[in-house]
From Swiss-Prot:
Organism listed in the record: Pseudomonas aeruginosa (strain ATCC 15692 / DSM 22644 / CIP 104116 / JCM 14847 / LMG 12228 / 1C / PRS 101 / PAO1)
Subunit structure as annotated in this protein's UniProt entry: Monomer.
Cysteine pairs bridged by disulfides in the record: none
Primary role: Catalyzes the NADH-dependent reduction of a broad spectrum of quinone substrates, generating the corresponding hydroquinones. Highly prefers NADH to NADPH as a reducing substrate. Also displays a small NADH oxidase activity. Does not exhibit nitronate monooxygenase activity; is inactive against propionate 3-nitronate, 3-nitropropionate, nitroethane, 1-nitropropane, 2-nitropropane, and the anionic forms ethylnitronate, propyl-1-nitronate, and propyl-2-nitronate. Has no azoreductase activity since it is not able to reduce the azo dye methyl red with NADH.
Top-level taxon: Bacteria
Enzyme Commission number(s): 1.6.5.9
Broad class of enzyme this protein falls into: oxidoreductase
Family affiliation: Belongs to the nitronate monooxygenase family.
InterPro entries documented for this protein: Aldolase_TIM, NMO
Residues that hold FMN according to the record: G22, M23, Q24, T75, K124, A150, S178, G179, G180, G201, T202
Protein name: NADH:quinone reductase
Amino acid sequence: MGVFRTRFTETFGVEHPIMQGGMQWVGRAEMAAAVANAGGLATLSALTQPSPEALAAEIARCRELTDRPFGVNLTLLPTQKPVPYAEYRAAIIEAGIRVVETAGNDPGEHIAEFRRHGVKVIHKCTAVRHALKAERLGVDAVSIDGFECAGHPGEDDIPGLVLLPAAANRLRVPIIASGGFADGRGLVAALALGADAINMGTRFLATRECPIHPAVKAAIRAADERSTDLIMRSLRNTARVARNAISQEVLAIEARGGAGYADIAALVSGQRGRQVYQQGDTDLGIWSAGMVQGLIDDEPACAELLRDIVEQARQLVRQRLEGMLAGV
């Protein structure tokens, strides 16, 4: 049993209230297994795999590396090439996966099918109204992305300090806090704000087991909290990415006005982002990173990272916070 017992740890059968959510091109077997073995809830990213058959093989590979629970992320976003979502969903179910994280567009049909097969569903969203809809659809938990997060933070620009308690005030299902988390201070803050766990992405990029080029990890460690850009705001498809030559070029095109997706499609191509992670040239394409870069200056193993987060959180609660109580 872990130090912290929450609705999240109880619902998903993990030791710590820490999740490694979906990360395109990164959520592979070695990453997920390392987090699972460390006691967190890990996910493979379905669309990192080129086909449903490849996803099934990756699930099998992950099971060779861990005997602990892990899930699969299925992101539902507009793509240049149609995605066979039903086939990916079937591969997840047939593989016996018990936890799925959905994100993006309306997950209704997928939630119903997953639940019919006994799969627990976490839906990641960026607004309380979306979380309430997911709850009505029957999800087992929601992951709430604050404005600080990497990837797609939505269009409302509400930071986690407000978004989390606003969600906790209205939701009944467990809440996972996403965006800006890297250490025990964040875990304690999230729990105090009403969350049941934290989700980390950028922090897991800078771990020993993360299957990306060392130069990308070094760039994260060297960055500060200002080293991100918000691109595609003019298209209402905002993405927070690491600031580089490509993100600046995209912003320049948007600033001229009247730009459509076709004007930036080649620059924001997912394949170029994949090459960044593989080749280590951080100016080669767009890649996701959150403001939390400013809190990252090391590259621990996942087991060390989770151990240190939980221990720091325990000490904060036992020593700092209890010590502030005036004789209560």
